[in-house]
């Protein structure tokens, strides 16, 4: 058991009410940063971890773009350090999952945990993140961090001079492919349709890039690997028009079919956009459509989606919550 897990409060099979100045939902960079700042402001925050403490960084083997580390660090280790710092500064961490919320009556807000605990919070920071959409292939999860990725900005550096595949046809896929040309020797875009959904200007850039080729009307049926530990060696493709299979060699597979924000719990409670992301009505703020409810990290960010930007908005949300609680 890790050191931080021994300090987490488990509320399994309990029925109690826990009151707090600030309740933070989510245990990724945004949530932990918010907790650290809130604890230092003597707000005595409570952080509810949700199902995946540590967020997406728990499945990221090497992190090279988080400031302060000259060499690559492990994603799970980084999250453990953030959690320890949050606890050290005075955060109470609850290993629980929020299953229902009621923001309709204003502060204090009432939230129910899967454990049976009722949380009563004067303010709330939502940092529940967003999950990359995956293809659902048998080897996909097993090879994450070993050649399979959903973030070119995070992992493109590891494919200098190598061949990679990008799966998808929207803005995300085209942007990922263009970014990867700065590192990879060649990028093959796999798209199940005969045209992209991406913006025209992005398509023009892609078609003018000599290091990119496109395979239309094609899906990935399997991801191949070899070695111990295994690494990606190729993909099995199926062409719709000919109903034939073909295998191509590749060093990396980038899945770029979008992200799903973890916001279903807040439908009807907060303003969400057409993709389910929490709307921040006021620029340069983290305030949601309900006063006293703030959002940080990927749950409100469909553009950057980086650990460092998530941490930054976590800091902002904590400062905004502090001002709200002070009546400023």
Residue ranges of model-derived segments:
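FAD-site-proximal beta/loop scaffold in flavoenzymes
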Residues: 5, 9-10, 17, 131, ...
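Beta1-alpha1 glycine-rich phosphate/pyrophosphate-binding loop at the start
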Residues: 7, 16, 20-89, 174-200, ...
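Phosphate-coordination loops involved in phosphoryl transfer and adenosine-cofactor binding
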Residues: 19-21, 160-162, 217, 290
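Residue-level detector of alpha-helix initiation sites
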Residues: 28-29, 52, 130-132, 171-172, ...
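A Rossmann-like FAD-binding core segment of flavoenzymes
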Residues: 86-113, 118-121, 182-282, 323-327
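Glycine/small-residue-rich loop that forms an oxyanion/phosphate-binding "nest" at active or ligand-binding sites
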Residues: 93-115, 119-157
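A conserved FAD-binding loop/helix module that cradles the flavin
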Residues: 174-176, 290, 296-328
